[in-house]
UniProtKB/Swiss-Prot annotation:
Extent of Basic and acidic residues compositional bias: 20-30, 160-169
Gene Ontology molecular function terms on file: GTPase activator activity
Record's compositionally biased regions (Basic residues): 10-19, 31-40
SS bonds (residue pairs): none
Biased composition range(s): Acidic residues: 147-159
Record organism: Escherichia coli O1:K1 / APEC
Listed GO biological process terms: ribosome biogenesis
Biased composition (Polar residues): 49-58
Short name of one Pfam family: YihI
Keyword ATP-binding: no
Protein name: Der GTPase-activating protein YihI
Length: 169
């Protein structure tokens, strides 16, 4: 005779039993009931909120409707005029530092590049560029610098190079 096949199955791991429709419905109702309970309890604001976080030394619960105990003046008091403090002026930069700031200004560089490319600037942008360039010229004059110095140095270097070439031949 053949050994029964049910015995071989029972020795292995038992299959998980499937839940019936009634059990599934009951679990769904329980989940829905728990979901409805979320949030604060009704009347928690008037009752004082959390009762678990009360201090041990205080027997009477604190009424949340009672506000601040700071005194409020009921009479008309003279207004105290505050003395205006003069705004602290920006520290003056040295002429050299101001010149370096103007020369490395990104907005000025971008606008000058647009001008070199042939674009026209708005009146506001053009006036801003003019003011900054005038300030750069003024600072360079005060510091004794000029644009011509750079050009003359380049010309001097070219002449020296020419002289070296001529001497070498």
């Amino acid at each position: 005779m053949k050994p029964s096949s049910s015995n071989s199955r029972s020795k292995g791991h038992a299959k998980a039993r499937r839940k019936t429709r009634e059990e599934l419905d009951q679990e769904a109702r329980d989940r829905k009931r728990q979901k409805k309970r979320r949030g604060h309890a009704p009347g928690s604001r008037a009752a004082g909120g959390n009762t678990t976080s009360g201090s041990k030394g205080q027997n009477a619960p604190k009424d949340p409707r009672i506000g601040s105990k700071t005194p409020i003046p009921l009479g008309v008091a003279e207004k105290v005029t505050k003395q205006h403090k003069p705004k602290s002026e920006k520290p003056m930069l040295s002429l050299q530092a101001e010149l370096e700031l103007l020369e490395t200004d990104e907005r000025l560089d971008a606008l000058l590049e647009r001008l070199e490319a042939g674009e026209t600037l708005s009146a506001e942008e053009q006036s801003w560029v003019d003011v900054k360039l005038d300030r750069i010229d003024e600072l360079m004059q005060k510091l004794g610098l000029s644009y011509d110095d750079d050009e003359e140095e380049e010309e001097d270097e070219k002449q020296e190079d020419m002289m070296r070439l001529l001497r070498g031949n």
